Structures are given as C-alpha cells and as structure tokens.
Amino acid sequence: MDASYNITPDGKSHYGFLLTVGHSLVGLKGGRIKTVVRSSTEAEIVGVNEVTSELLWARDVLVELGFPQDEVLIAEDNNSCITMLQTEPRNFQTNSRHVRVKWAFYRQEHEKGILKLFYCPTDIMRADLLTKPLRGKVFRDHDLAIRNGAPMAI
C-alpha cells in the first residue's frame, strides 16, 4: 500500500495497492483521496483504510471458497503511519475527525487479529507504480518483479 501526498493542483493525494495471494498479483486499485489531508502520514492512514475494506472482502471470499486465512499483511513504507496505527486509543492524537474514523476502523480489525501492518522499504514498495511516476530502472524493476511473481509488498 502506498500513498502520495498533495500531488494534484487542488491539494489532493493518491493511494494505491496491489493485492497478492502467495506471490501472485490478483488485484490492484488506485485512486484519489477525496478529502485534503495535512501530511503524508494522514494520506497513508486514509490509504490503509481503503486497503482494509478491500482486503476484508478478499479474505471473506477466500474463506467462503474453503481457504482458511491467517491474518492479512499490509506492507507500509511510512514509519509514522505504522506508529500511529499501532497507537493505543487513549494516546492517538489528530485534529482531523475523518482520519480518526479511518484509524479506528483499522484498529478494530487489527485487534480482532485479522490485519497486521509491517514495514516495507520504499525501494521494494511495488505499489509505488500506482501512486507516483517512476523512472527508468526503478519502473522496470517493479514491473518485472510483479510480472515474475517475485515476493512483493502490498
């Protein structure tokens, strides 16, 4: 999962994610964050919220088809986002109500043991393809890794 902060003329941000089962890409989605966020961390939190909804749906489909699922992993390259999403409710601070609601949704699913965030270094964050222009070798490396089913981050 990746988000790009304030990249449009109207101050909006983008998010994107790749959905994999094993090492196979089975879905992807990207889009514009509808509200203006005030930091890259808030953009990432909103993006994680979008991913959470999609992952819960995909997990339910797999369970319904008879494939029991462990916790779903979400790769994140923003340490501040990871820290905020793992913060206990009494310590979470934000002035943005919409960010607090999105944080609460992730926390709810995390506390059920369904979702888990992990740090993924930016240089192997394949979702960058959906959120920002990549040049030359970086683009080709991500594209090749996705096509070959290399281990990747969401």
Model-derived features with residue positions:
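RNase H-like nuclease fold core
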Residues: 1-41
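RNase H-like nuclease module associated with reverse transcription
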Residues: 34-154
